[in-house]
């Protein structure tokens, strides 16, 4: 491997060590660049400490092994109370209200780049923090800092980080954002790090590998209701609207309906007042398509945001292709977004994240859908 000339001698970086390959390689790369590196492992969930689904003990063991291999300190911190108050209660409240939240975005906002940064500052005297996220930062000549998409388009995580301020971005380093995922694994293998072939974590961290309905049912009571077609025909029952999201195809239990064509059934709407799940056939059913949306709880990385009437790109879910759109401010907290072409399965409660080329501008929460 080509060695990197150290350029940051003396600057202290606290790396969020998750026990995964991305944070492992981030720590190694920062050491190569001359930073004084220490690790910090966060414990954010305590409900499953004695449960088969909890991977925290194994992750801590892997993080410690990597730090031992690299010859750096590993600190630990418990943010379970902050996580419960600021992430999990939000998650439950949104589902209870019939929306589909994204707790990973809230975790980045409240824990990884707030509680973690404060702890690194106040307790560990850090100059920077670092995470294994696939994004990049750009320091401009005017002193501003921007967040860019990661080089690996399939792994780019800017969608999950749009709530960061430019001050937080300026305090953060993202070494693997400049690399493809396969390069990260190759570096880890070359350095003999035990995480080099560790499986990437998927899904919501506190749910782990268990079934979503089983998990959510322990915190929110089931509210069964009817499944109807857009025409009002009752064709089945559901256990709770919270278990379903727009565009969902699997797990509806209504396959093989008589008098229907062979197209699969999709969730196309939720009637919250009647507690009815509305389904239609085909992934481009008219009720599933939106021509636009309103977005509130706006956050812009540079605090100012795009200008009124501009034509830029938006993602309404992770790994979605960029959707060209036009923005209009209805007030300082709300945007009306009109897509160039109709988009399927835009989901209230999820985040809409806006881009100008490679730059992640920020975003907000999808509130209302515009149809027709």
Curated annotation (Swiss-Prot):
Q: Which GO terms describe its cellular component?
A: cytoplasm
Q: What is its subcellular localisation?
A: Cytoplasm
The protein's GO terms of the molecular function aspect are: ATP binding; tRNA binding; tRNA-uridine 2-sulfurtransferase activity
What are its GO biological-process terms? tRNA wobble position uridine thiolation
SS bond list: 107-205
The residues listed in the UniProt record as binding ATP, with positions renumbered to this chain, are: 16-23, 42, 132
Q: Which CDD domains match?
A: MnmA_TRMU-like
Q: For the site Interaction with tRNA, which positions are given?
A: 133, 350
Record keywords: Transcription included? no
Q: Which UniProt keywords apply?
A: ATP-binding, Cytoplasm, Disulfide bond, Nucleotide-binding, RNA-binding, Transferase, tRNA processing, tRNA-binding
Active site per the UniProt annotation = 107 (nucleophile), 205 (cysteine persulfide intermediate)
Record's SUPFAM superfamilies?
Adenine nucleotide alpha hydrolases-like
Region (Interaction with target base in tRNA), start-end ranges:
102-104
* The protein's Enzyme Commission number: 2.8.1.13
Region Interaction with tRNA: start-end pairs: 155-157, 317-318
Major location category of this protein: cytoplasm
Catalytic reactions of this protein: S-sulfanyl-L-cysteinyl-[protein] + uridine(34) in tRNA + AH2 + ATP = 2-thiouridine(34) in tRNA + L-cysteinyl-[protein] + A + AMP + diphosphate + H(+)
Outline what the protein does: Catalyzes the 2-thiolation of uridine at the wobble position (U34) of tRNA, leading to the formation of s(2)U34.
The family assignment reads:
Belongs to the MnmA/TRMU family.
Q: Which PANTHER family match?
A: MITOCHONDRIAL TRNA-SPECIFIC 2-THIOURIDYLASE 1, TRNA 5-METHYLAMINOMETHYL-2-THIOURIDYLATE -METHYLTRANSFERASE
Q: Could you identify this protein by its name?
A: tRNA-specific 2-thiouridylase MnmA
What organism is listed for this UniProt entry? Answer: Shewanella baltica (strain OS185)
Gene that codes for this?
A: mnmA
């Amino acid at each position: 491997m080509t060695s990197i000339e150290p350029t940051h001698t003396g600057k202290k970086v606290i790396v969020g060590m998750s026990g995964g390959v991305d944070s492992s390689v981030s720590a190694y790369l920062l050491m190569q660049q001359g930073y004084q590196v220490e690790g910090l492992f966060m414990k954010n969930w305590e409900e499953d400490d004695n449960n088969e689904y909890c991977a925290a003990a194994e992750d801590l063991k892997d993080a410690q092994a990597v730090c031992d291999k690299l010859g750096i300190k590993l600190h630990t911190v418990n943010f379970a109370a902050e996580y419960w108050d600021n992430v999990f209660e939000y998650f439950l409240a949104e589902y209870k209200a019939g929306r589909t939240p994204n707790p990973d975005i809230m975790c980045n906002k409240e824990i990884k780049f707030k509680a973690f940064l404060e702890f690194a500052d106040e307790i560990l005297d850090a100059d920077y923090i670092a995470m294994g996220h696939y994004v990049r930062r750009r320091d401009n000549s005017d002193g501003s800092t921007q967040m860019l998409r990661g080089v690996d388009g399939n792994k780019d995580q800017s969608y999950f980080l749009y709530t960061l301020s430019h001050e937080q971005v300026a305090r953060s380093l993202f070494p693997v954002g400049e690399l493809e995922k396969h390069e990260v694994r190759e570096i880890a293998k070359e350095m003999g790090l035990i995480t080099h072939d560790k499986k990437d974590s998927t899904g919501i961290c506190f749910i782990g590998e268990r079934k979503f309905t089983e998990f959510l049912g322990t915190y929110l009571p089931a509210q069964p209701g009817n499944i109807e077609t857009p025409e009002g025909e009752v064709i089945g029952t559901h256990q709770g609207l919270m278990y379903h999201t727009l565009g969902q195809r699997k797990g509806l239990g209504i396959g093989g309906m008589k008098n229907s064509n062979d197209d699969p059934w999709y969730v196309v709407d939720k009637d919250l007042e009647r507690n009815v799940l509305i389904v239609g056939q085909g992934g481009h059913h008219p009720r599933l398509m939106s021509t636009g949306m309103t977005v509130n709880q706006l956050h812009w990385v540079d605090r100012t945001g795009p200008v009124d009437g501009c034509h830029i790109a938006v993602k309404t879910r992770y790994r979605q292709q960029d959707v060209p759109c036009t923005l209009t401010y209805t007030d300082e907290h709300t945007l009306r977004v009109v897509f160039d072409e109709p988009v399927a399965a835009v989901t209230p409660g999820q985040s809409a994240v806006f881009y100008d080329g490679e730059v992640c501008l920020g975003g907000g929460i999808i509130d209302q859908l515009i149809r027709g």
